[in-house]
Amino acid sequence: MAFKREIQGVVVKIAGEKTVSVLVERKVVHPKYRKIVKRFKKYLIHDERNEVKVGDTVVAVECRPLSKRKSFRLKSVLATGVE
């Protein structure tokens, strides 16, 4: 079985029906200055049951492309956000 990539991030927007936008943070070492810097990227996640809210911390797993920009499915909700 193939390795499925997992990402963890915070829901920043309800992007539509069964779709949420998740902000993922990663830390990398700057090649010249050797300082740890934060890099951010937004992913569209498929949420079949519309169970997440803005501010929730979620885990998503890679799947087949569901649309032009959506290729991750919701796996679990780690923490609920404060609204």
Swiss-Prot record:
One of the primary rRNA binding proteins, it binds specifically to the 5'-end of 16S ribosomal RNA. One of its GO terms (biological process) is translation. Keywords: Ribonucleoprotein, Ribosomal protein, RNA-binding, rRNA-binding. Part of the 30S ribosomal subunit. Belongs to the universal ribosomal protein uS17 family. It comes from Campylobacter jejuni subsp. doylei (strain ATCC BAA-1458 / RM4099 / 269.97). PANTHER family: 40S RIBOSOMAL PROTEIN S11 FAMILY MEMBER, SMALL RIBOSOMAL SUBUNIT PROTEIN US17M. GO terms for cellular component: cytosolic small ribosomal subunit. InterPro entries: NA-bd_OB-fold, Ribosomal_uS17, Ribosomal_uS17_bact/chlr, Ribosomal_uS17_CS. This is Small ribosomal subunit protein uS17. One of its GO terms (molecular function) is structural constituent of ribosome. It comes from the Bacteria. Pfam families: Ribosomal_S17. The gene is rpsQ. NCBIfam families: PRK05610.1, uS17_bact. The keyword Ribonucleoprotein applies.
